[in-house]
Amino acid sequence: MNRLTLEEFKEAEKLPLIVVLDDVRSLYNVGSVFRSCDAFRVEAVYLCGITATPPNAEIHKTALGGEDSVDWDYFKTTEEAVEKLKQKGYFVYSIEQVEGSTKLQNLPEAHEELFKQEKESEKQGNESEKQESSSLPKGYAVIFGNEVKGVKQNIVDMSDGCLEIPQFGTKHSLNVSVTAGIVVWEFTKLLKL
């Protein structure tokens, strides 16, 4: 296996994706998300509200050191995190089952639509206008909500869009860390490190 050292990981190119945890209460879920983010070299994890932060033995138990390799930041509120992401030029998705959400399997088409809009913008303007009005994001951010309440409605409203994982059984929810692993993998395929 080609495992990176911690130093090599810190220097390696990252997937332009930031994972945001919105009031995730389980320390084991937080650790598991860090572990998945390490596996796919995610740019950073933003921990918000009641979400616990490293160093923490329970987070470490499931993260297996992922909390040391993946950059992270803490925000008192998820609103602050979303505002920062938008200022930095990220396209923000809430992962939530809401009317009008994009099915995760349709993410490539949604991504392609951003590029299509950018190409149309290029045809209509000069170089300086392109830079000012670029519709291409610097990267993506995905927000995962509380295990019981999901992503708060005001955060959904602040987001650029919503993604959901279609489900076909008797339950209409997945564990937040499982959901994060699935979504991060889809972005890994889309953005190709």
Kindly label every feature range from the protein language model.
Residues Q153-L193:
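Structured adenosyl-cofactor binding patch, chiefly the S-adenosyl-L-methionine
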Residues Q105-K138:
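Intrinsically disordered, low-complexity terminal tails and inter-domain linkers enriched
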Residues S36-D38, A110-H111, M158-G161:
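Glycine-rich, phosphate-binding/catalytic loops in enzymes
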Residues P54-I59, K149-I155:
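Short, glycine/polar-rich helix-capping loops at beta-to-alpha or helix-loop-helix junctions
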Residues A81, L85-K88, V151-G161:
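A structural motif corresponding to the C-terminal end of an alpha-helix
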Residues N2-G100, T188:
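RNA substrate-binding interface of SAM-dependent RNA methyltransferases
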Residues V98-G100, E147-G150, F168-T170:
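Short Gly/Pro-enriched loop/turn and capping motifs at secondary-structure junctions
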